[in-house]
Amino acid sequence: MTEKRYLKWYNKVGYGSGDIAGNVVYAFLSSFVMIYLTNTVGLNPGIVGTLIAVSKLLDGVTDIFFGSLIDKTHSKMGKARPWMLYGYIGCAITLVAIFAIPTNLGQFAQYAWFLIAYTLLNAVFYTANNIAYSALTALITKNSAEQVEMGSWRFMFAFATSLLIQSITLGAVTALGGGAAGWRTVAIIYAIIGLIVNTLSVFSVKELPEGELEDTTDKKEIEQDEKYNLVQAAKLLAGNKYYMMICVTYILQQIYGAMISMGTYYATYILGNQNLFGVFSWAINIPLIIALVFTPTLVAKWNGMYKLNVMSYTLATISRALVAVAGYMGSGNVTLMLLFTAIAALGQGPWQGDMNAVIAACSEYTWLTKHKRVDGTMYSCTSLGVKLGGGLGTAITGWLLAASHFDSALTVQPDSCINMLKIMYLVIPFALDAIITFLLSHMKVEEANEKLRAAV
């Protein structure tokens, strides 16, 4: 039986463009906040890492809180779209605040400024915006193929934006005056772009009526399915093993991204050319985009996402191992590093494309086993993973830089720092890919749902 289709091509493209706005925040923040704070503001990377870790203590609570609020929201715009729209206003303001720390403040005040702005951005505004954006996957269509297509469009825009930001930001900062003024101006430009694109994305789609989502028009039944408190929501998530696996996978992916962002330091202090960071960004993002183009076709051909995800991530793991080998062979092997980096990214692409569809399947699993509709709460794993994983990853990089005696005033770093940069950029990404591959090999939620439906 052919599934009903709900979306036009422009709905999918409009939805996907929302991650331009998301990555104007996330790619900019994760790739450059540490080098901005250490080399421009002059803060200690170890202290910055600790502040980020402290900030992350709030994230788990706010993710479930906002996810639950989305599930219980009833408005003319739907459940998720209001949160996506208004949450981004706060994202734009706090993003600028992070990259506009006054240089004439005392250091204690600078640390406090960063902590407050970073916490508000991550624990409040980005949480509301990103969970709502992700939840739309399950709220504007019930067609699994369309959900995969939405994920592919989303991450094509995400990686294209990430590539552009990683390629042009350092040059843009210099062109706009350099130093603190350059970073502040770039942040303002990115925030304005994000606001415009996020607004367009919100109004490019329309949520399905709640009765159609629930397969019932009985309002009392719908209200009963949504009747649970914050503690019960947390229990529903914890009781879904597939949610837990996706959440851990998401966190590991973001830590991976934080380690890859150390490419700015690796290119500067080991390869001797900071512009190579942009070249490596191309080697990562172009293959990812290519993989995303073909992901919907491959999912359809293989009748599901499981085999594709496991096989492609196995390729990624092997390739990251070869990147490490090439890196330790010496800085003259940049070509080999770029080649294996590209192959690894190609292997990571399918999971990025179908991940939101897998989360929708996890939400369906909770519906089939607990008869509770928790779409918004279920998608908290996306925001939680981005913030907790990205924050923890950035914190770890700060701690490791401090432990290895990194000194931003030196043009040549000590051997302890050089060795640590190699571990962060070469070894840890391989180890993380291996763990993710193991988790994906147990992500059999599609099969579980089929068995549950057959038993009804």
Task: Enumerate the predicted regions with their spans.
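Membrane-embedded alpha-helical bundles of multi-pass transporters/translocases
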Residues: 2-456
